[in-house]
Amino acid sequence: MAACSRGLVARPFDLTARGAAHWPCPAPRRRAIRCCCRAQQEPRRRLSKAAAAAPERTEEWRIDGNKPAAAARGRRRASLTAMPSLPFPSPRSRRQWKQQNFYPRCTPRGPAPQSRDTPPKRDTGIASEKEWGINLLDEAVKESGTNEDGSTWYRESGDDRGDNGYRCRWARMGGQSHDGTTEWKETWWEKSDWTGYKELGAEKSGKNGEGDSWWEKWKEVLYQDEWSNLARIERSAEKQAKSGAENAGWYEKWWEKYDAKGWTEKGAHKYGRLNEQSWWERWGEHYDGRGFVLKWTDKWAETDLGTKWGDKWEEKFFAGIGSRQGETWHVSPGGDRWSRTWGEEHFGNGKVHKYGKSTTGESWDLVVDEETYYEAEPHYGWADVVGDSTQLLSIQPVERPPGVYPTIDFSASSPAPPSDDPPGMPPSPLE
C-alpha cells in the first residue's frame, strides 16, 4: 500500500511458495581441496505420490507427482538439487510482486511517509544495507496526519542515550486506512556504545483488507569478542507471511556470522503450510578458518492424512579427509516406513569407501578410485561482509570522556544457538 495525498492504496497479497524448501543455490567456488578423482556433491533426493505406493523403488523424489526414477543397485550418483516448489493454488498466489523502488521517507514537515508494503519474498536470504535504504534523521520528529480518504499516517524519530556510552538513533513510521483493515508499520534503528558494539536494523509489517499479513526483521551487528579479541560481524533476517483466506503461510529465519580470522557460520530454518500439507527445512554451514568444514541439510514434509517424507545429509572434511552420509525416508498413512541410508568415507589418498542399505534389503559396500572435492572456504566470507557493511561500520558512537572506560561483562554467556525444534508460525506483530 502507498500513503500519499490521496490515501493508502492496498496492493494484492502474494503467498507464492515457489521457493518452498529450496536448497541454497550453489555458490561460486574460490578454493577447494582436490585429491585425485571425480567430483562428488550432495546426493539428489526427491519423492512423488507414486513413491508412496512403491517407495522401495524410489531414488529421486518430488512433491509434484512426477514418475520416480528407479535407483541402480550398488551405485550412487551425487548432485545438488532443489526441493520442488509447493505453490499456493489460489488465483491470488499466482500474481507476482514487482520490486518497489525505495524512495525517501522521514523528511521533516514533508509529505506523508510512503511504505514499502510489499510482503517479503521467499528464499531471498539476508538483504543488504542498500536494499533496506535506512536513512535516519539528526533531529527529533513527531508528525501525523489524515489523508483525503480518511486514512491516517504518522512519523517520529529520536535519539536515546544510556549507560556505557549507549546510543540508539531510531525512526518509526506507519499508517492505516480509515476503517483499520489496511495497516503498515516500519522501524529503523542504529545502536552503539563504548565497547565498539554497533548495530543497524529494520523491521516492517503490514496487513490488507483481505486479512493477509506479513512481517520482516533485519539486523547486522559489529562487536569485539571478549575472549578472542577478534572483530565479528553477524547478520540475520526473519520473515513471515500469512494468508487471510486459507490455511496457508510461511516463516523463515536466516543468520550469518563471521570473524576476522575466517571463522564462518551460516544457516536457515524454514517452515510453510498450504492447507493440508506442511513442510520444513533446516540447513547449516560451519567453517573454522583453519580448513575444517561442516555442512548439513534436513528437510521433511507431511500431510494431515499422515503421509510423511524427508531427506537429510551431512558432510565433514579437513585436509582432504572426511565423510558424507545421508538418508531418504517415507512413512505411509498406515505407519509403514521405508528408508535408504548411504555413506562415503574419503581417505585422502584417492580411495573412497561407499556403503548403504535400504529397508527393502538392498545394500552395497565397495571402495572406488575417486577424487575428493569440497569447499574449504565459504564463497562469501569476512572480506565480503566488511565490504558490504559500510553503513554499519560508519556508525559514530558517543564520544568517550578522557579517563572513562567501557564496562565489559565477561560473565555474560554467548548467544544461544538456534533451537533444533521445527520453526512454527509466530503471531503477527499486528495481531
Swiss-Prot record:
What's this protein's function?
A: Binds preferentially to highly ordered alpha-glucans, such as starch and crystalline maltodextrins. Involved in the organization of the starch granule matrix, thus influencing starch turnover by modulating the accessibility of starch polymers to modifying and degrading enzymes. Required for the control of starch degradation in leaves and starch distribution in nonphotosynthetic parts. Promotes gravitropic responses, negative in shoots but positive in roots, by facilitating starch granules (statoliths) formation in hypocotyls and roots columella.
Location in or out of the cell: Plastid, Chloroplast stroma
Q: Which gene encodes it?
A: ESV1
Null allele outcome, as annotated, is: Reduced starch levels in leaves and loosely packed starch granules in grains. Absence of starch granules in hypocotyl endodermis and root columella leading to impaired endodermal plastids sedimentation and reduced hypocotyl negative gravitropism in the dark and reduced root positive gravitropism. Chalky rather than translucent grains due to abnormally small, loosely packed starch granules with conspicuous crevices between them.
* Annotated Pro residues bias: 415-431
Q: Which GO terms describe its molecular function?
A: starch binding
Keyword entries, A-Z: Chloroplast, Plastid, Transit peptide
Task: Give the top-rank taxon of the lineage listed in the UniProt record for this protein.
Answer: Eukaryota
What stretch of residues directs this protein to its organelle as a transit peptide? 1-19
Biological-process GO terms, alphabetical: negative gravitropism; positive gravitropism; regulation of alpha-glucan metabolic process; regulation of starch metabolic process; seed development; starch granule initiation; starch metabolic process
Q: From what organism does this protein derive?
A: Oryza sativa subsp. japonica (Rice)
GO cellular component annotations of the record: chloroplast stroma; starch grain
Chain segments annotated as coiled-coil in the UniProt record: none
Primary location recorded for the protein, binned into one broad class: plastid
InterPro entries membership: Alpha-glucan_binding_chloro
The name this protein goes by in its record: Protein EARLY STARVATION 1, chloroplastic
Q: What family name appears in the similarity comment? A: Belongs to the ESV1 family.
Locate the region Disordered: 65-126, 403-431
